[in-house]
Structures are given as C-alpha cells and as structure tokens.
Amino acid sequence: MTSVSWIQKGTHIAIGTGKGLVQIWDAERTRRLRTMTGHTARVGSLAWNTHILTSGSRDRLIYHRDVRAPDQWLRKLVGHKQEVCGLKWNCEDGQLASGGNDNKLMVWDKLSETPLWKFSDHTAAVKAIAWSPHQRGLLASGGGTADRRIIFHDTVRGAVINEVDTGSQVCNIAWSKNSNEIVSTHGYSQNQIVVWKYPSMTQVVSLTGHTYRVLYLAMSPDGRVVVTGAGDETLRFWNVFGKRPGAREDSDGGGRLSDWGVIR
C-alpha cells in the first residue's frame, strides 16, 4: 500500500499499491469493489473530485478515472518527467494541481490533457500542495530539502505572488478552514509543525516533538485539530485552530480533542 484517499462523501476509500494498481474499497463492509490498472509503477498519490478519482505514479503518468464507469481510466495526463508525488483537486473551480520529483508544479483545468500552467520555481520535489478555501485560485506548494520554500501561486493569472523560506524540507501543507492561516509540516533538520499567518507569513507558532520528518498531516472535519505522523512511529494531535466564527460549541461530554485546550 503506497497511498490512501477517502471519497469526499460516502464510505469508499481508494488505495494505491506498489505494483501500480488502484483499488476501491467499501470501508463500511470491508469489501474490495474493484481493481483498476494502467500504471506500471507504484501509485504514490491519489485525489478525489466527486466521482472522479485521479492517480499519480512513479511511471510519471496521471490518470483520471470515473469510478461509476467500467473503463479502467478516462484520461491520461503526460507532463511530469519524474514521479508524480503530489495531487490535489480544487473541487470548486475544477482545477487539479500536480507536483513531481522533477521539481515541477502543474495545474490542469478540469479533465484537460494539457496543463493550464507549468511552474518551475521549486528546486526540489513538490509533494506538499494545498488550495486556499478563502481565495479563488490561490495555490500553495512546498519544496523538498534542497528548496525548503512554500510558494504561493495565482492560478487565475498563472503567476507567483509570494514565497517564504521555511528553513527545512516541506512535507505537507494544509489551509485552516476557519481562518486565513496555513499549517506546514517539515523534515530535516527540525521535524517541526508550523502555523503561519497569511499573507504576511509570520509564524504564529512552531511545534516540536517528532524526532523524524513529519510525513503525514490530516485535519479534523471541524478544522480545529490536526494530526501528524512521522518516521518516529508516533501520531500526535494538535489543537491549533479556533472554531469558525458563528459556529456553536459541541455540547457533548468529555473526551473530545478540544478539551485538551488550544496551543495558543
């Protein structure tokens, strides 16, 4: 198993394998529904846009798959010169961002087989990708150890609008749903989690605790808690963001992550 991604609504989960296969499972019934072919090497990235499942592989290809149809794939995208290591859909605008080990970031419009934009600003692999939920066409990407930057792109105009040197490998990026802030996880040399204020990119807080690079990042549905996973074989939960303005507090009893208190 080399990648996992939940469908936005429902109980289906997609799994990429080291043999180039993409499997769809019903998590509720723990039953495999289908296996899709096409790739010839490991599938390291997956992204959903409703019923469209997109997969990226070490074979440098990207496939769009309509999981409702019997066909193995719907579109094949050729653009990256090395492994595709990051994929992220902007479901509202129908744009797909892809990052590769070739240091390239590409933006594809809907199901087009030709990239809308090609960005060559990074100097290391681009695995970390995130679309802003607050501003149309605002895309953040993070570079690897030889780059260390988070770069912000305007995909309406095809321009770079901002960047910050984080000082270490950028492994993941996620925007806060509740405020105009962004959280990033890092590898060598500090293995930290950082919350930034956008657009000033001033650090709100830097969190340490992991002893190896922080490879995984996920956010709770309410946008308040993030969980990180690292090569030190630990999961850590961080209550980093406040509630959405106007949202009511959950009135359930104890045991919630929010009971642990925010970190700022």
Mark where each language-model region is.
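WD40/WD-repeat beta-propeller blade-loop signature
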Residues: K9, R32, R42, N49-I52, ...
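Loop/turn segments within WD40 beta-propeller blades
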Residues: S5-G10, G16, S45-I52, L87-G94, ...
